[in-house]
Amino acid sequence: MRNLQLSIEREVERAIEGVNLKDTRRCYRDQSEFVVLERFLTQPVVDQLLYEVDLLTPDVNRNYIPGHKKGGSVSFYALQNQAPAILSLYRSPAWLMFLSRLVDAPLMLCPEDDPHSCALYYYTQPGDHIGFHYDTSYYKGRRYTVLIGLVERSEHCRLVARVRKRGETEEIRETRIPMDPGTAVLFNGDTLWHAVTPLGKGEERVVLTLQYVTDQEMGP
């Protein structure tokens, strides 16, 4: 486990070295706390994560809420027992510092009893999707979402983000984002109106979701 943590940490540091922090922060601010880092993670990290995606497939819990979402997921509780690479990425000191610098706030892990703090989402059946929503935070501070693409074998299933330019109320564009393996998307869950379009027949998509907060206490 220790060797795996060190390996993940080294690869995360390598990935961060390839990012122009100044330009990325500017893009994040200009897009009202939203930015895409295409193919950010290195292949060794992606390979480790994909191994755990396959390992956890039998634990996928399918759910369907008419008019809102359909798909499968593996919660943080299952990841704690079977996904050391995913946990190493989620808890990576270098990763946490990098994200904190991007959002200009000291970020923390979610409490251990939050099942959504780190989870896998499997889109494997035709029509799997999530309707437009905010990742509303019930913490006292802000909560930030990071999406990591792992499996992207779809021409139809896309993250759709309605991005507003900072300081403007008028919507500037609707962005459709393919979550290629290693691509990372960072945003403030309370400010980004987003969805996932329906999966087509014979397609597959798997995304890792990581949540970070500025205050670990729940609000009233």
Report the location of each language-model feature.
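Catalytic core of non-heme Fe(II) oxygenases with the double-stranded beta-helix
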Residues: L87, M97-L192, E203-V207, T214-G219
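Short amphipathic alpha-helical segments
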Residues: M1-Q5, Y212-P220
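A sequence-level detector of short, solvent-exposed, charge-rich linear segments
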Residues: N3, L56, V60, H68, ...
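Residue-level detector of conserved, well-ordered beta-strand and adjacent loop positions
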Residues: E38, T197, T209
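Non-heme Fe(II)/2-oxoglutarate
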Residues: R2-I8, V12-L102
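Short, Lys/Arg- and Gly-enriched loop/turn segments at beta-strand edges
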Residues: W193-L199
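Generic structural "secondary-structure junction" signal
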Residues: Q43, A78-N81, R91, Y122, ...
